[in-house]
């Protein structure tokens, strides 16, 4: 007696993201996203794939190219299940950049590539360049920021907190 399992799905399981994406939206918004997801998931397999996108766009009178569909699919780091769908929309709607973009922006001012920036230097940058912060805004930022006893702002940890929330004290 052979115990071969029938292969019903060839999709690999999406990587689990430690994300508080469900906390970003209220219950009615999540329900609306679920309805939108189900409308796009034409074959009802719980994932949005290239064919689902094609069928959905075709139903809207569009004729997307394969390259266009491929570019859309490549915005996700893996298969698009509902959590991934919500995460992608959450980032777009929240207006926050992806984690690596934020980290790289800080890294421009980290000449020694230590993952930290001296807090006084960062304050100067934030209050004199670009969309200038007030001193009060910098103080507010520093209140919960990962700054060591030497006054080094850990932008790698800060970026992680910004995108995923603070670690629990037990971690």
From Swiss-Prot:
The answer to keyword Thylakoid applying to this record is no
What is an example of a Pfam family matching this protein?
A: EF-hand_11
Q: Which residues carry this modification: Phosphothreonine?
A: 18
Report whether Metal-binding shows up as a keyword of the record: yes
Residues recorded with modification Phosphoserine = 19
Residue positions annotated to bind Ca(2+) are 41, 43, 45, 52
The molecular function terms of the Gene Ontology recorded here are:
calcium ion binding; myosin heavy chain binding
Source superkingdom: Eukaryota
One Gene Ontology BP term is: regulation of cell shape
The EF-hand domain, residue ranges:
28-63, 97-132, 133-168
Q: What else is known?
A: This chain binds calcium.
Q: What does this protein do?
A: Myosin regulatory subunit that plays an important role in regulation of both smooth muscle and nonmuscle cell contractile activity via its phosphorylation. Phosphorylation triggers actin polymerization in vascular smooth muscle. Implicated in cytokinesis, receptor capping, and cell locomotion.
Protein name per Swiss-Prot or TrEMBL: Myosin regulatory light chain 12B
- Annotated organism of origin: Bos taurus (Bovine)
Which taxonomic lineage does the organism of this UniProt entry have? Eukaryota, Metazoa, Chordata, Craniata, Vertebrata
Q: Gene for this protein?
A: MYL12B
């Amino acid at each position: 007696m052979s115990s071969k399992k029938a292969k019903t799905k060839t999709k690999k399981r999406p990587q689990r993201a430690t994300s508080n994406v469900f906390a970003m939206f209220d219950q009615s918004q999540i329900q609306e996203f679920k309805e939108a997801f189900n409308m796009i998931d034409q074959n009802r397999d719980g994932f949005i794939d290239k064919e689902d996108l094609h069928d959905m766009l075709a139903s809207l009178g569009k004729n997307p190219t394969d390259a266009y569909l491929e570019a859309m699919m490549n915005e996700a780091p893996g298969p698009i299940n509902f959590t991934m769908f919500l995460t992608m929309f959450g980032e777009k709607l929240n207006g926050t950049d992806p984690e690596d973009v934020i980290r790289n922006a800080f890294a421009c001012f980290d000449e020694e590539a230590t993952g930290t920036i001296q807090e006084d230097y960062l304050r100067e940058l934030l209050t004199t360049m670009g969309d200038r912060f007030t001193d009060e805004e910098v103080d507010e930022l520093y209140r919960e920021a990962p700054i060591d006893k030497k006054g080094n702002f850990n932008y790698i940890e800060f970026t992680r907190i910004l995108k995923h929330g603070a670690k629990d004290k037990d971690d």
